[in-house]
């Protein structure tokens, strides 16, 4: 008989093992009776329908759903005292006792409660203990101690201990199972009842339901149907963000293991798919979200859910399943606070007969809004059937919370949410209670007003406290702010006065560094609707020639974003020339060679701005005062740039002078008062660079390349041995305003001296020529680094390419072996003298031989000589190397004396002697310990030589040998491992 049942049971793997994963697999394995399989249909029933039990222990119709079905007036309930890590117990009890169906059944057990005795510890009925605990929470005004439950913890679960942290879902399953056993013990032959009958207990009728499992063969499309009893649904939330997504994943069709299902039609193992559906929904649906894994980790993601759920789309296609109500409402839940299942805290949330929710945190009870309930990271949720929604069609079932509880027979007004009118509001609303859960006479009216406000504003909020009746004035104020907003300095609109003040503050801090446009252009910018998109200001062009004339095309850019990183002064300026007063390139100018009169007119307005109470005012009077000053500066600068155009004779000088002019003219901040007090120079006489008097000395503002020239001049002074005066600004060949050319300097000038120095005329008689390795900072007469780059090579960077000037580099012209010979020949010297001598020797050898083959032979010979010299140097270093503790030095007596032939390589007599003392510590026949102090040991032998002859007498060979060894070691000598017998005889 068992053999005939194997194919049928192979069709469906047990539910906990088939849909298990890392989350919650342990709890499913611990409760094998949680879900049972029914593969034996009644002989007279359809095999595709749920079988009917032979006996019903408690009818399903006797379960009273909802708080209104009981004659008792239900209270909120008190908290429960935590007696030591019992938060899991308190939270589970609070969640169970706030389920209306379970609470109504416990209260109805008055007859059994009178006959059952629960006073004895470790015995009694757990159902009566639950009923008394429920009555205690309803009657007391303070927190109760659930001692009737935790005193029977061993009866509920054997491995649970009071005071230890446990899992709330595990305790829930064992508690419900214990209550079922207690109910079955009322019947005499309960052990003989089949599984279908045992599932008809009150606990089975409240929490129990049936799932239809359909396994479809992919080869012959044969469908095998089985039914499974369940009391909770374990939903995987790893790939779900809401409760509906978790339901979709649980009831979706999944593929079984390939070739792992034995089909009844094919009679072989094939691939198949499996899908669950609701055959009979439970009255109270218990949902556990798989937040814990096997190793104790917790998945703390937020799972959104609604207070009402509809499971109609997951119902089976059978007529009985389609006719049942599948709309549920939230009644209670258990939450877990913590990072893992081994630590944390459990709390509970329960509903009352008024429809409000309360949070139960051990002994603390406080009301909680529906919005906070839905935002809670739930662990266990209890939903109960909503029979009030079962009468209406599924399409007309609203998802929001009703204003009434829905279980009374009183008619609902048409203005409430349950009305099927077109203006019906769908969504969560407040129940007809106040903030603390107490009803008032205006609750229903207030809810209707909230609904109208929601329809006007287009918002749907869950609670009335979030509704705002003053939104039209706020909207009007916001529109007014938008209308009156003006463009700020960055081109964006802002209605906040703080942003305007902050932008003005930034402009005040930067007014002495940055050019500011004129008032007329500011007015034009405000009148014209410029673009509001952010644009970067034009930066100074450091690569183009500033002396080339370009087309005058003034471009006005509406963006007025100041540069936020101005260059600060590195020198304490106390006076400045007019040529350094030119500001930074204006963002309104797109090129360097635009109309300079416009640029200077804008820069002249920089001094026209004044600070008034921390704000920048562009006064017309202050701007008109400096009009003549701006015109004079314009004429002077025009003459300056005309002279610069005439003095530009080469491309290298132009490229070098252009960035320095910009640095001198644009990037040095100047004080406004000093620049205003200085009179403009004559247009015919170009101004010279400024000489500044400060506390540290006299400073001269020049360009960076002039500093390099002065450094080179210092070198020239050392070579020539004659003092050189510092050139005055009028005679400096680097002066950008000088009309003379740099090539017309007299030989006495530092530039001529440096030219002679680099050409080699003055260098031949004083010092050795410099070796140009491409990394020295010496520059040529034109002050450019391009000539140094021309001498460098691209060797080692891939294919051979030309140098900077398009010709092969100087290093590439020489053979590679010769270059290596030059480098190796000068390897051994630290001071560098050998390098020069080796290079000179190689050059002399190369110049003496004109043939290329001779050059290669010479190079090879030099390589061999250099290698031999390096080997000789290395040998000398090894001989002269001092001992730094890296090599162990061992003294040995084998190298001298008559025992040289008996020495062993690597033998260390000191190590053997020290080790022998430790090895023979307790040896020697007499049992006396050998002391490490040899002097003490010697005295010991002298004092005890007459008591017993331990060493065979004073004249024995062993005693004499040890004494000789001590004298030999004290003298600093060594010894071999074994002494010859002839020497021992001589000692004796």
Swiss-Prot record:
InterPro entries noted in UniProt: Papain-like_cys_pep_sf (IPR038765), Peptidase_C19 (IPR050164), Peptidase_C19_UCH (IPR001394), USP_CS (IPR018200), USP_dom (IPR028889)
Acidic residues composition-biased segments: 592-601, 650-659, 707-717
EC number: 3.4.19.12
Biased composition (Low complexity): 31-48, 408-422, 490-509, 669-679, 892-903, 930-943
Any GO molecular function: cysteine-type deubiquitinase activity
Locations listed in the record: Nucleus, Nucleolus
Ranges of compositional bias, category Basic and acidic residues: 632-649
Catalytic residues (UniProt): 87 (nucleophile), 345 (proton acceptor)
Biased composition (Pro residues): 680-689
Residue list for modification Phosphothreonine: 561, 565, 685, 728, 749
GO BP terms: germ-line stem cell population maintenance; negative regulation of macroautophagy; protein deubiquitination; proteolysis; regulation of apoptotic process; somatic stem cell population maintenance
Residue ranges of every copy of the USP domain listed in the record: 78-386
Superkingdom in the source lineage: Eukaryota
Residue numbers carrying Phosphoserine: 419, 421, 575, 577, 650, 682, 688, 746
UniProt keyword terms in alphabetical order: Hydrolase, Nucleus, Phosphoprotein, Protease, Thiol protease, Ubl conjugation pathway
Coiled-coil ranges (or none): none
Stretch list, region Disordered: 16-55, 393-422, 483-782, 868-988
GO CC term (a single one): nucleolus
Quaternary structure note: Interacts with atms/PAF1, but not with CycT.
Family designation: Belongs to the peptidase C19 family.
Protein name per UniProt: Ubiquitin carboxyl-terminal hydrolase 36
Upper lineage: Eukaryota, Metazoa, Ecdysozoa, Arthropoda, Hexapoda
Gene assigned in the entry: Usp36
């Amino acid at each position: 008989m068992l053999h005939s049942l194997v194919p049928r049971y192979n069709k469906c793997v047990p539910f906990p093992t088939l849909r298990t994963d890392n989350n919650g697999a342990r709890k499913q394995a611990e409760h094998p009776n949680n879900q049972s399989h029914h593969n034996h249909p009644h002989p007279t029933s359809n095999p595709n329908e749920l079988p009917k039990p032979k006996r019903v222990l408690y009818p399903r119709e006797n379960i009273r759903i909802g708080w209104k079905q009981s004659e008792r007036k239900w209270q909120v309930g008190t908290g429960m005292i935590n007696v030591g890590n019992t938060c899991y117990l308190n939270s589970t009890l609070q969640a169970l006792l706030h389920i209306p169906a379970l609470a109504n059944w416990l209260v109805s057990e008055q007859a059994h409660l009178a006959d059952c005795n629960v006073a004895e510890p470790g015995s009694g009925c757990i159902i009566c203990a639950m009923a008394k605990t429920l009555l205690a929470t309803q009657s007391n005004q303070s927190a109760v101690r659930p001692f009737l439950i935790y005193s029977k913890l061993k009866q509920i679960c054997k491995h649970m201990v009071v005071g230890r942290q446990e899992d709330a879902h595990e305790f829930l399953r064992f508690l419900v199972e214990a209550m079922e056993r207690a109910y079955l013990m009322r019947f005499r032959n309960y052990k003989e009842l089949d599984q279908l009958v045992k599932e008809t207990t009150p606990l089975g009728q409240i929490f129990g339901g049936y799932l239809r499992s359909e396994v479809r063969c992919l080869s012959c499309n044969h469908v095998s149907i089985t039914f499974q009893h369940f009391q909770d649904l374990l939903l995987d939330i790893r790939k779900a963000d809401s409760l509906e997504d978790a339901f979709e994943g649980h009831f979706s069709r999944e593929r079984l293991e390939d070739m792992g299902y034995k089909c009844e039609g094919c009679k072989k193992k094939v691939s198949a798919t499996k899908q669950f559906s609701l055959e009979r929904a439970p009255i109270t649906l218990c949902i556990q979200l798989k937040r814990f894994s096997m190793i104790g980790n917790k998945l703390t993601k937020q799972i959104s859910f609604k207070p009402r759920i509809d499971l109609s789309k997951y119902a089976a296609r059978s007529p009985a399943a389609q006719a049942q109500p599948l709309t549920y409402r939230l009644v209670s839940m258990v939450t877990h606070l913590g990072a893992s299942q081994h630590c944390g805290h459990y709390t509970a949330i329960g509903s009352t007969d008024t429809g409000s929710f309360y949070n139960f945190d051990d002994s603390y009870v406080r009301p909680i809004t529906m919005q906070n309930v839905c935002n809670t990271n739930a662990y266990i949720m209890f939903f109960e059937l909503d029979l009030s929604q079962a009468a209406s069609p599924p399409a007309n079932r609203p998802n929001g919370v009703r204003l009434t509880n829905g279980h009374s027979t009183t008619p609902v007004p048409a203005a409430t949410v349950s009305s099927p009118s077109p203006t019906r509001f769908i969504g969560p609303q407040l129940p007809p209670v106040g903030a603390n859960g107490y009803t008032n006479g205006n609750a229903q009216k207030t809810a209707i007003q909230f609904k109208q406000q929601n329809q006007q504003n287009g918002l749907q909020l869950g609670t009335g406290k979030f509704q705002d009746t003053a939104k039209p004035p706020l909207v009007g104020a916001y529109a007014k702010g938008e209308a009156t907003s003006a463009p700020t300095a960055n081109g964006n609109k802002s209605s906040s006065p703080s942003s305007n003040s902050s932008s003005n503050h930034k402009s005040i801090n930067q007014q002495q560094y940055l050019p500011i446009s004129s008032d007329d252009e500011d007015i034009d910018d405000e009148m014209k609707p410029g673009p509001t998109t952010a644009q970067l200001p034009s930066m100074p062009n450091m690569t183009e020639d500033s002396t080339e004339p370009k087309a005058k095309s003034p471009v006005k850019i509406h963006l007025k974003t100041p540069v936020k990183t101005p260059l600060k002064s590195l020198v304490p300026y106390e006076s400045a020339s007019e040529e350094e007063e030119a500001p930074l390139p204006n963002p309104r100018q797109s090129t360097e060679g635009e109309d300079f009169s416009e640029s200077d007119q804008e820069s002249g307005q920089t001094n026209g701005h004044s600070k008034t109470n921390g704000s920048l005012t562009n006064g017309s009077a202050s701007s008109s005062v400096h009009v003549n000053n701006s015109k004079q500066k314009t004429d002077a600068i025009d003459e300056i740039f005309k002279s610069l155009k005439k003095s530009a004779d080469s491309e290298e000088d132009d490229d070098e002078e252009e960035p320095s002019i910009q640095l001198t003219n644009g990037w040095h901040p100047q004080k406004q008062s000093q620049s205003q007090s200085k009179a403009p120079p004559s247009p015919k006489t170009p101004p010279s660079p400024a000489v500044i008097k400060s506390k540290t000395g006299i400073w001269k503002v020049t360009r960076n390349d002039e500093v390099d020239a002065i450094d080179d001049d210092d070198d020239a002074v050392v070579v020539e041995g004659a003092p050189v005066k510092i050139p005055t600004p009028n005679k400096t060949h680097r002066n950008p305003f000088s009309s003379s050319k740099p090539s017309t300097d007299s030989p006495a000038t530092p530039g001529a001296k440096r030219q002679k120095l680099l050409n080699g005329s003055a260098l031949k008689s004083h010092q050795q020529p410099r070796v140009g390795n491409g990394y020295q900072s010496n520059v040529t007469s034109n002050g450019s680094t391009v000539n140094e780059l021309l001498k460098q090579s691209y060797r080692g960077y891939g294919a051979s390419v030309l140098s900077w000037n398009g010709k092969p580099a100087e290093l590439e012209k020489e053979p590679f072996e010769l270059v290596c010979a030059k480098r190796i020949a000068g390897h051994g010297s630290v001071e560098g003298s050998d390098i020069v001598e080796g290079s000179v020797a190689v050059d002399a050898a190369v110049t003496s031989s004109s043939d290329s083959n001779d050059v290669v032979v010479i190079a090879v010979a030099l390589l061999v000589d250099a290698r031999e010299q390096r080997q000789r140097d290395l040998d000398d270093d090894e001989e002269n190397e001092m001992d730094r503790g890296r090599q162990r030095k061992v003294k040995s007596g084998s190298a001298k004396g008559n025992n040289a032939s008996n020495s062993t390589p690597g033998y260390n007599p000191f190590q053997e002697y020290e080790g022998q003392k430790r090895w023979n510590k307790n040896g020697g026949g007499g049992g006396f310990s050998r002391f490490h102090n040899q002097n003490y040991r010697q005295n010991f032998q002298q004092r005890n030589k007459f008591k017993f002859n331990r060493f065979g007498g004073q004249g024995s060979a062993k005693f004499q040998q040890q004494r000789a060894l001590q004298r030999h070691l004290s003298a600093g000598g060594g010894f071999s491992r074994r002494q010859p017998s002839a020497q021992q005889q001589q000692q004796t």
